[in-house]
């Protein structure tokens, strides 16, 4: 057995692509990634959860660094987001704001389903628990996610946007090595263990 952390990934992040599947809106699992990124990054990317947050005023464009576009000196492009959502909304017979809000709700439901699945699998009752939000967009969805899960408390660390990197930087360095012997336990195997351990050092 190899040591590992039980991590469940969910395709509902800021880069999750919004697209039509027949007459239904789909969120993820495809991601725009960092390149080209969301439509607002000015690199020709698709509509994403980030763009939905921007359209609904949950992202403050004037607070973003001007690092977008071909010369990397422009703010996020709110105009292209409005235009692209208008096209998507027309195809669905809805308003752009309703489509964006629906996309966020789909993302929250996807995240909530993953948390429920993991907690049920482990036999844990999360009622009365605390939802810890981290990541660049963690705070944008934490309260809606807590409501969806029936949780009353959300912990949003002041460094939530860089919490993973911060934790990695604070962790003690260590090296763990192992070898698979593929043999039945016997006196001969026990006698050979010191040599095997020496090779791992």
Regions found by a protein language model. Name each.
Residues 1-201:
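N-terminally biased helix-coil "hinge/interface" segments that flank
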